[in-house]
A protein has these predicted regions:
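Small-residue-rich beta-alpha loop regions that form the catalytic core of phosphotransfer
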Residues: 3-100
Length: 100
């Protein structure tokens, strides 16, 4: 594994369901050749700060949570003027999380 990925998730989004799938998610990315750095948000702006901190240290950022988590990651990456790919696994309760 020579690729690195930051996985940021909101443990409270979607009634905490993401936690039951966490090992499966990490396993999928490991099989894809990624070393996964996992960060569970604890307070507002955590995802934003982690995205800014890691955008130059990883090859991919994936987040899971509601629209707020996604917004924080995208904003953090955009402020750094980075072109790093961002993935999103919806886990929130809002309707915008259920559309494609």
């Amino acid at each position: 594994m020579n690729k690195k990925m930051l996985f940021v998730f909101n443990p409270k989004a979607g009634k905490g369901k993401i936690k039951t799938n966490l090992l499966d998610i990490v396993d999928i990315f490991n099989k894809g050749g990624y070393e996964v750095i996992i960060y569970s948000t604890q307070k507002p702006k955590d995802a934003y700060e982690k995205a800014k901190e890691y955008e130059s240290k990883v090859d991919l950022i994936v987040c899971s949570g509601g629209d707020g988590t996604l917004d924080e990651v995208v904003t953090g990456v955009m402020e750094k003027k980075s072109s790093i790919p961002i993935g999103y696994i919806p886990a929130g309760n809002q309707a915008c999380d259920r559309t494609t």
